[in-house]
Design a protein with these regions (language model features):
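Short edge-strand/loop segments of extracellular domains
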Residues: 50-51, 101-108, 163, 169-175
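Double-stranded beta-helix
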Residues: 78, 91-152
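Short, structured patches in soluble enzyme cores that scaffold and shape functional sites
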Residues: 46, 63-65, 82, 86-90, ...
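Non-heme Fe(II)-dependent double-stranded beta-helix
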Residues: 1-73
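Secondary-structure boundary elements
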Residues: 32-41, 74-78, 88-95, 107
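Short, conserved beta-strand element in jelly-roll/cupin
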Residues: 69-93, 136-139, 144, 169-173
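Non-heme Fe(II)/2-oxoglutarate
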Residues: 149-237
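A short secondary-structure junction signal
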Residues: 54-61, 70-73, 94-103, 109-113, ...
Length: 237
């Protein structure tokens, strides 16, 4: 799809700051609080650049559970996940802000059931638009929402406009019902940019065992150091 032309998984061949923004300590703590657990995993993180006229970015309202789980959202929010959208540029209404509908409003019109019964229900889309809110904001704005929250992308109309953002999705560790990215599948990407700069807590979000875990033996420590020669493993010894 054209609108996903500039949509790329981490890690990138660039600064450690951009590579690690998705596991910023504040986001990790936010996710832990929202999911009511001390153990979270990052299962999606992508940079997304949009430019005026490059594609039709206008979307219908949808929920992310469709490609984040093979089942449906749970009433227990701890069994779902939390998604962050981080703006790196100022985003006005002319720069394609995400629009969303509060869960209370969508529930009042049987949002989830109607969506599952008929995803192309135009009347449902019209009703959702009556309640839509804008996530427009200056650079640094953070939008947090769950996989059961209706939202949609909007078009950029500012001449020469652009929008730089990142998505970051967390789930409770061990929740196999939620997924998106298998990080090892992207083994050819520059993971050294993450391993050489991340804390053990940040690496744990990718599934790397914490220091003291039984996984770490003299053998695994030695082999891991060979794989990432510049990784400071002193905390794991």
């Amino acid at each position: 799809m054209e609108q996903f032309k500039n949509f790329e998984n981490i890690p990138f061949e660039c600064s450690s700051s951009l590579n690690l923004i998705s596991v910023h300590p504040s986001l990790i703590e936010f996710a832990r609080s929202a999911l009511k657990t001390n153990h979270v995993r990052l299962y999606q993180a992508q940079a997304w650049a949009k430019f005026t006229g490059e594609a039709d970015f206008d979307q219908a309202f949808h929920c992310d559970f469709g490609n984040h789980t093979l089942t449906v959202p749970s009433k227990d929010e701890c069994l779902n996940s939390i998604t962050f959208i981080i703006y790196f540029t100022d985003v006005t209404e002319a720069h394609g802000p995400t629009h969303y509908v509060n869960r209370t409003d969508s529930n009042n019109i049987e949002g989830m059931r109607r969506f599952l019964k008929h995803r192309e229900d135009l009347q449902h889309q019209k009703e959702l638009r009556k309640f839509e809110r804008s996530a427009a904001g200056p650079a640094g704005t953070l939008l947090a929402y769950g996989i059961d929250v209706f939202h949609r992308g909007t078009n950029l109309t500012e001449p020469g406009g652009y929008r730089y953002a990142m998505t970051s999705c967390f789930k409770k560790a061990g929740n196999d019902a939620i997924g998106y990215t298998s990080w090892p599948w992207h083994f050819a990407k520059p993971w050294h940019n993450i391993f050489e700069h991340a804390t053990p807590d940040q690496l744990n979000c990718f599934g790397v065992p914490l220091p003291g875990d039984p996984f770490w033996t003299e053998e695994t420590l030695s082999l891991a150091q060979l794989r990432y020669p510049k990784w400071d493993m002193s905390e794991y010894l």
